Amino acid sequence: MRQFDVIVVGAGHAGCEAALAASRMGCETLLFNINLDSIALMSCNPAIGGLAKGQLVKEIDALGGEMGRMADKTAVHFRILNASKGPAVQSSRVQCDKQLYRLAMKSVVERQPKLHLFQSLVDCLLVKDGQITGVADQTGVCFGAKAVVITTGTFLNGLVHVGTSHYPAGRAGEIASISLANCLRKMGFEMGRMKTGTPPRLKASTIDFSRLERQDSDPAFEPFSLSTERLGKERLPSYFGYTTSETHRLIRDNIRFSPLYSGVIKGVSARYCPSLEDKVMRFADKGRHPVVLEFEGLETEEVYAKGLGNSLPLDLQEQIVHSVPGLENSEILRSAYAIEYDFVQPTQLNHTLETKRVRGLYLAGQINGTSGYEEAAAQGMWAGINAALAVQGRPPFVLDRSEAYMGVLIDDLVTQGVDEPYRMFTSRAEYRLILREDNAALRLTPRGFDLGLIPQDLHEQISERIRRIEEGMKCLSSFKIYPGTAVNSKLEEHGSPAIKNPVTLFQLLKRTDLSWEDLSMFQDLPDFPEDVPDGYDRMIRKQIEIEAKYEGYIQRQREAVVRMKALESRRIPPGMDYSAIPGLSNELRMKLARVEPETIGQARRITGMTQAALAAVMIMIKKKEQDTRGQSPLPAQSE
């Protein structure tokens, strides 16, 4: 039996990041995939990033991951979402050439030292005395490992639905992983069923784009990756259209043919990415729904028809597509379909994504009940890092909710579990003002360097930027502007109120009507800082300006983080008997026993937890601590 340090099962977005992280940290790693030609395949939309997802991609890159680099390399359309809003909710999104992305990632994986590829279907896990020891494939060949990461996406008991027809598949054209799903169930894991889907792909030459609204790429765009020096020049537009009353009539009149509404599909659908059937039936008051057409690549006729996802029979799909203005004569190249698959309830995982039931077994991606390439990649990297650290006998890697969107994602999964496909949103991150997309590198590159995933030169570059930001803030805070006719005239020329008392440049920069560049109006003042405004690069200027304009809000969030960390530092003894705590509801007792929170902070985030219940848990912890020290549980009370 061949032996490896780490085995990764599934080479999608989670699997690639897991395998690359483990091998780059020095572990001999084996990456399985059912088909090596579908490594990092974009099964659904041809895009990377989006609201809150862009933050995840930047964080993956800051830790030394690959998704951001591949997105930059293969992008053909760029957008900054929420550009008119504050920096806390701005996110980047790119459309990629789907085939170029797959090939680029495959090339990286193939060339990575210590990373071995093998095309096969893994059927079962090998476990001895509660410790993972390897896997066996469909031919019965065994492969040994000290740690195994499962990143199977929608392949566990996958079932594709098109109208009244359904067949086992991990996605259209690829076989499902049935034996591995059964293996996990036999091992005692609590599992559930979820459903997702994908819209039809249309032939570009059969679409009348003149009847649709064109959207071109944003001219100015920051790359996802720190290592990207320049972006490609080739661009493709997107097009917008809408469904019609005829579209909606076709769906309502034929809803009985939808497996979603006939009761055939049992899996839970994603609330935030509903099928067209759901949109029409649940939002009957809406006269139309948006349709977005996105090219899948530079050298293909395939167009992704976002908004037309459904699971109806092909003949009805054609009628629905043809009911959209501009698509009357369009040809379907690939039909839309729905897919059901098994997932493992993630409350059975530790914060490292290692399972509580089997040591050395890690789960990442859609197997944990999430949706989205970015959520999968973030989990894959997290699991791969921790698998490597465990093999090497090093402390685990965990980021908390104040350190990264990745930390929010993992904590939500293992603390609250999922009852529908989980998608990341900026609203899930309570500290989003300090977890911005623009400061991901400053937050996490030092951590990536400590793990051995970030090279020395990049680490030094980011360290210098951090130093320059601190220096720039100090510089602006130390130079004062005094009220006077000349000074106030300059301010009024820029549409900013006059000053009555001395203010620093940093205080002026807090004003919404002044930017960093506007500070140059005072360059003729004696001793004006020579590095302002041109002595700092654009990234440094942006960080200083955000720190100035949002200083009060940022400070409040940092104070909230201190309070949160105080709760996180209060450990809950392992094996706590929640049934013995008076005042807890049966529901909370079950949730606490199921999640097994490690800290008071984590217990506080369990759905349904109340202040009274949390106080009861803390009293029991204090009692156990006192009992351990041989003291009486409570001090005597004097009358």
From Swiss-Prot:
Main location: cytoplasm
Entry annotated with the keyword Ubl conjugation: no
Location in the cell: Cytoplasm
Cellular component GO terms held in the UniProt record: cytosol
Pfam families: GIDA, GIDA_C_1st, SAM_GIDA_C
Cofactor(s) of this protein: FAD
Quaternary structure and partners: Homodimer. Heterotetramer of two MnmE and two MnmG subunits.
Protein known as: tRNA uridine 5-carboxymethylaminomethyl modification enzyme MnmG
Origin organism lineage: Bacteria, Pseudomonadati, Thermodesulfobacteriota, Syntrophia, Syntrophales
Gene name per UniProt: mnmG
